[in-house]
Amino acid sequence: MASSNRHWPSMFKSKPHPHQWQHDINSPLLPSASHRSSPFSSGCEVERSPEPKPRWNPKPEQIRILEAIFNSGMVNPPREEIRRIRAQLQEYGQVGDANVFYWFQNRKSRSKHKLRLLHNHSKHSLPQTQPQPQPQPSASSSSSSSSSSSKSTKPRKSKNKNNTNLSLGGSQMMGMFPPEPAFLFPVSTVGGFEGITVSSQLGFLSGDMIEQQKPAPTCTGLLLSEIMNGSVSYGTHHQQHLSEKEVEEMRMKMLQQPQTQICYATTNHQIASYNNNNNNNNIMLHIPPTTSTATTITTSHSLATVPSTSDQLQVQADARIRVFINEMELEVSSGPFNVRDAFGEEVVLINSAGQPIVTDEYGVALHPLQHGASYYLI
């Protein structure tokens, strides 16, 4: 059908009906009805440019009729149908067959152009809309990674919690400690003062002494009176329990003496073991060798025990001095100081001049520490 309508302007000149051709000639809007110069006209009239044709502006009623016919599927109406459409449009204004024909041609080109624009727009919008569902797997992957990271961090937290568990009289004491594993020396005074009294916590990290922050008052710590309620065992040591009467007596004694609150931070296999004897009040400190993922703490394989012989340090409460070890203030006995019992076998204590403190075979310093002096552990 499109090929038959290719040469429409020539078909209008064929004059199939004399009345129709006469009507087209009389129409001022047809291209053939332009002002022609007659052969008998003068030369000045021939030189005159033809007047411009007025453009056909269809009325709203005519546009509605044409749109209804075009939307019904008649994109290229045949010649007979064009005449019928023109007769229908003439009820609302003057119109020619060529006007109807060209309106359908323009309407078809406009629809094609509109479809082309929609197709291009959809083609450009597809790459933008397709990546939008992609963040979902990334979100799922991020959620899975976050869940996996949370899973990976949960065991660490549980490890820290397990590390800070202390079995005291058959119950577990949970402490709030820094995440770094540290070896802390507690204050130890029962009856007569024995060993050393640490006014602040002392920690080893990678062989260096660093100061641990004191826990807040709300920290779940162990008072010395609670430590003396029973022995905190390491490994398979049997726990010993005291009677309620002895416990109350211990608490009354410890409440009379001003003491600081102590928190114990332990590693996987490191725990302090205290054995309370009613006779000599010895304090036994079991320090097995440990290896942590964050730090490596090397201690002696042998049991660091306060000797119960003449080498045992028994210092009265009024015979104590204060020294600075690794910039930390400590209160120690004024007599010979046992370095091995306090810090382990492999630790060497040096003074501010860099000279090591000479000790005997039991780890006791040959010369007492000087009051107010500074010492360092290596």
Swiss-Prot record:
Keywords: Cytoplasm, Developmental protein, DNA-binding, Homeobox, Nucleus, Transcription, Transcription regulation
Composition bias type Low complexity, residue spans: 32-42, 137-152, 161-171
Inducing or repressing factors: Up-regulated in the zygote after fertilization by the transcription factor WRKY2.
Main localization (coarse): nucleus
Pfam families, sorted: Homeodomain (PF00046)
Subcellular location per the Swiss-Prot or TrEMBL entry: Nucleus; Cytoplasm
Single Gene Ontology BP annotation: regulation of meristem growth
Bias type Basic and acidic residues, positions: 45-54
InterPro entries on file: HD, Homeodomain-like_sf, WOX8/9-like
Disruption phenotype: Embryonic lethality when homozygous. Reduction in embryonic growth, failure in axillary shoot apical meristem and leaf-primordia initiation and growth, and failure in primary root growth and lateral root initiation when heterozygous. Wox8 and wox9 double mutants are embryo lethal, with embryos disrupted as early as the first cell division in the embryo proper.
GO molecular-function term, one example from the UniProt record: transcription cis-regulatory region binding
Residue spans binding DNA: 51-115
Annotated stretches, region: Disordered: 1-60, 123-173
PROSITE patterns according to UniProt: HOMEOBOX_2
CDD domains from the UniProt entry: homeodomain
Extra remark beyond the main annotation: The seedling growth arrest phenotype of the stip mutants likely resulted from a G2 cell cycle arrest of the meristematic tissue. Exogenous sucrose in the growth medium reactivate the stip meristems by repressing TSS and activating the expression of cell cycle regulators, and thus promoting G2 to M transition in meristematic tissues.
Purpose of the protein: Homeodomain transcription factor required for meristem growth and early development. Promotes cell proliferation and prevents premature differentiation in meristematic tissues during postembryonic development. Essential for maintaining tissue growth during embryogenesis. May act by repressing TSS to promote meristematic proliferation. Involved in the transcriptional activation of a subset of cytokinin response factors. May act as a negative regulator of cytokinin signaling in the dark.
Family, per entry: Belongs to the WUS homeobox family.
Protein name: WUSCHEL-related homeobox 9
